UniProtKB/Swiss-Prot annotation:
Glycosylated residue positions: 25, 35, 50, 55
InterPro entries according to UniProt: Mg_trans_NIPA
Record-annotated membrane-spanning stretches: 68-88, 115-135, 137-157, 166-186, 208-228, 234-254, 274-294, 306-326, 337-357
One GO location term (cellular component): Golgi apparatus
Main location: Golgi
Protein family: Belongs to the NIPA family.
Entry function: Acts as a Mg(2+) transporter. Can also transport other divalent cations such as Fe(2+), Sr(2+), Ba(2+), Mn(2+), Cu(2+) and Co(2+) but to a much less extent than Mg(2+).
Keyword flag rRNA-binding: no
Cell location: Golgi apparatus membrane
Protein name as annotated: Magnesium transporter NIPA3
Residue intervals on the Extracellular side: 1-67, 136, 187-207, 255-273, 327-336
Native species: Homo sapiens
Amino acid sequence: MGAQVRLPPGEPCREGYVLSLVCPNSSQAWCEITNVSQLLASPVLYTDLNYSINNLSISANVENKYSLYVGLVLAVSSSIFIGSSFILKKKGLLQLASKGFTRAGQGGHSYLKEWLWWVGLLSMGAGEAANFAAYAFAPATLVTPLGALSVLISAILSSYFLNEHLNIHGKIGCILSILGSTVMVIHAPQEEEVTSLHEMEMKLRDPGFISFAVIITVISLVLILIVAPKKGQTNILVYISICSLIGAFSVSSVKGLGIAIKELIEWKPVYKHPLVFVLLAVLVLSVTTQINYLNKALDTFNTSLVTPIYYVFFTSMVVTCSAILFQEWYGMTAGDIIGTLSGFFTIIIGIFLLHAFKNTDITWSELTSTAKKEAVSLNVNENNYVLLENLECSAPGYNDDVTLFSRTDD
């Protein structure tokens, strides 16, 4: 009989549960609990347990750090693929328009014969797949805000390949988005709170999350059934609020399905778990609702307003849902929480500058020339003020006049 191993906190100790063990030869073993008995007190046993606990803690920390880096790479890769896909598809559509084919906006489907458009579509598919996989390795608090990088990459590539002008506001917005993303990566949660479907099920049964889900569902139904038919065409926040509220459930479902796929790769019988099918149904329903109302928002209101507002609302709801469901913030220090929020708000400002002023044609040379003109006019006004002040000081006062006339009389 080998050394006894103590399960880490949070792992269930019950018959039939499968757990992972890291072996000394850099391999991994899967063990199934077949018998549960009471622990007998023994000094030697406690020594072995402490040794095992230390080894498990070290291996768990290494695995968590590795998973975080994998999730980060997948999230950034997703943004690159998705941001590039917009440029590739737009380039393909422009080539078709230059050849005289019917445009897609006019009901044409000739883009299906354009290879560049298909490359863009495949790039978007690869980006969505990478984003899906990122949720299985990294916290949603980190993965979701990094989606702003796709907007940044699309804006930069469009200025080079589509000859679209990127003004000074857009460049500042890109810099702020990069800085905000970097800050969020530095202060992101380092450990995953949910690593198995069993843990996911326990989190979903938490009273706090159940209350949150009920409140979100009620608000969404009120917006869909009552508010949207009356105010949807005049208030931009109605459609975007529906997309954002439902989006919290879609990201949570993606997170759970990502964990299920990871366990399936590890040859665990996840298909027997009913939670997988529940998460899949919630994902399909929430994504369908999101696409429907996001299309309504884009068709009704200006895209430059819809995009930044939707990003802020959607990301805020995802971060809130992650804090309640996965409790990713509980293990973070106050400095990391402040850093994460600061990075998020910096990204918001960058996205706002990138979209809100994209039609404003202002260059850096115009700003510098305007500043020089203001400085010159300010100097002229100061010189006039000094000249008037000197004239006033040099003019004879009333007392001087009295003294002058009195001397004359003498």
